[in-house]
Structure formats: structure tokens, C-alpha cells
Amino acid sequence: YERVPHYRDLTPEDEWALLERGLNRVTDTCIPEHEAFRRLQKHIYKIWKDADDKGERYFPHEFMYKMLLSGVLEEYYEIDLKDSWMYAAAEKNLPIIVPGWEDSTMGNIFASYVIKGDLKASTMKSGIEYMTSLADWYPKNSANGIGFFQIGGGIAGDFPICVVPMLYQDMEM
């Protein structure tokens, strides 16, 4: 990963130079494409394809859990698994709500396989299904109070706080 602290000042030429070096910029951080996403792609595709062939459907985080727990990424680990929050979540099968996943690099890769006809879009559960799942989970777990660990803003921040008004106002609970 490469930091770009002055990313707002980049010219189109600067942006192109980063891209030519194989770096995908996400705000102030450049992610080396072949060191991250392409490394995962062959492994996650097999898991997507297996589910697709069986007519099974999962959420994006469930597919990631399957990949992590399968051990196919062990050769790439750069930290001890005991220090990985994602691996700990996978081991405990914690619910992770990933709204807007379709607008991510992995979402784009999944969409490319759908466009090529290799996978069905319905294999991946949608954002609406995340909301309905959260709406089902919330009343079952909120009696003693609940907490969320939020990563990111925008839709990631708005999504969990929208479920309560939806339950009260739209569902009239």
C-alpha cells in the first residue's frame, strides 16, 4: 500500500501515473492491484462458482468467510491470524452488514463475471436483503442493548441507523 496524503491536489497526469504503476487509489491510499484484489480473485471466483452451480446464495461477507476459513490465502498472510479482526469474525460467524458492496472492487469483479455469463447475479444476496436481514436481527437482539463497529462513512454509516426508523415508521412496529 502506498499513502497519498495530498490526494486532493493530484492532477489527471498524476492519477494516470499511479494507474500506470498498477496502483488503484482509494482517497489517500493506493492499493497495488496485483498484490490485493487479483490475488484474491482466483480463490473467491471458485467459491462464487461453486455456490452458483449449486444454486446457493450468500451475502458478500459470507463468501469472504468461506474463503478465509478454507485456508487458500494462508501463503499470503502478512500478520498472525490472532491479530485479524476479519478472521476472528469469520470464526465466530458474526453478522457483518456490507451495504453498497456492489460499488467495491470485489463487487465490480463479481459483476464482470455476471456480464460474461459465468455467474448469476442472484448468487450474491443484495443490499435490500442486507437491510431485511438487519431488520430481522435487530428486534431479536436489541432487548439488552446492542453495538455496532462501523468501518467507513456514507452508506456504511447510514445503513445501520436507518433500520430503526424503518421498523417504527415503515413497518409500524
Q: Where on the chain are the PLM-derived regions?
A:
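Conserved catalytic alpha/beta core of Sir2/sirtuin-type deacylases, generalized to analogous enzyme cores
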Residues: 1-173
